């Protein structure tokens, strides 16, 4: 993949999987094979549409069938999750809950994309604020929507590491926090 002006947007994560479908299938098969030896989950980054979710699920089903045909053991109930980091997916969480087992909010990327702030551009970094009311509403909406469907949701990124924000995060309800 060639260098791009803004590598955080555009062609990365789930968006490259189709071009590299055979590599993606190999990775899925490897994860599935490893799942026979311990508890594993699969989480897909940069999801922005149901079409991407359904494509990933199709590839996962194909990889599972290949392993069944080869009599290779794996966890049939391996969970599939997505990162909530592209704002468009926030508006289809209800549909995502029908197809996905768990969610993780990528606070760094979601803040950047929701507020249209390039974290690496010194002229606009002052606008990068995970405590912006719009971001907090999005966070609350995601947690409530996912919980209403009985699904697990976590939070990763810098926001989860800020001790001063912990009371606010606890107020959202049961969410796991990870600093990445």
Task: Place the predicted regions along the sequence by residue.
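Conserved alpha/beta-domain cores
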Residues: 1-180
């Amino acid at each position: 993949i060639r260098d791009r002006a803004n590598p955080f947007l555009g062609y990365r994560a789930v968006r490259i999987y189709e071009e590299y479908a055979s590599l993606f299938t190999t990775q899925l098969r490897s994860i599935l094979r490893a799942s026979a030896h311990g508890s594993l989950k699969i989480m897909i980054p940069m999801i922005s549409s149901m079409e991407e979710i359904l494509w990933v699920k199709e590839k996962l089903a194909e990889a599972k069938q290949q392993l069944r045909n080869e009599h290779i053991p794996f966890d049939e109930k391996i969970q599939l999750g997505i990162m909530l980091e592209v704002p468009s997916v926030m508006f289809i969480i209800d549909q995502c809950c029908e197809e996905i087992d768990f969610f993780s909010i990528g606070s760094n990327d979601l803040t950047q994309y929701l507020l249209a702030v390039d974290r690496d551009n010194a002229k606009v970094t002052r606008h990068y604020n995970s405590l912006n009311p719009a971001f907090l509403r999005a966070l609350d909406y995601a947690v409530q929507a996912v919980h209403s469907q009985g699904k697990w949701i976590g939070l990763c990124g810098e926001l989860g590491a800020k001790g001063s924000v912990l009371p606010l995060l606890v107020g959202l309800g049961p969410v796991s926090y990870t600093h990445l």
